[in-house]
């Protein structure tokens, strides 16, 4: 078999899983319930964030918080302060791709 297969969690429970973390790319899957979020941090690579379901609430650097619905794709440059949260009623599910892979 040439391809590699990776399974991701399903459901509504808080999940942060590193699906792929190699020398080329980091591919992360996240599930956040209402009022859950990530610790504030700085992006350590270019970040491509896809909202699969729910609404993403995100504050970047000193901007106001913005909301993004399912099927939104955000491209965030390296070195940006990020505050990622689920302020909505629905479960938030995201795919986060970091490319190139952080060193």
Which sequence ranges carry the predicted segments?
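Conserved short histidine dyad/triad with adjacent acidic residue
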Residues: 26-43
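Glycine- and acidic-residue-biased ligand/ion/polar-headgroup-sensing regions
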Residues: 45-56, 61
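Short acidic-glycine-tyrosine-enriched beta hairpin
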Residues: 63-78
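Conserved hydrophobic/aromatic beta-strand scaffold that supports enzyme active sites
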Residues: 18, 27-29, 48, 73-75, ...
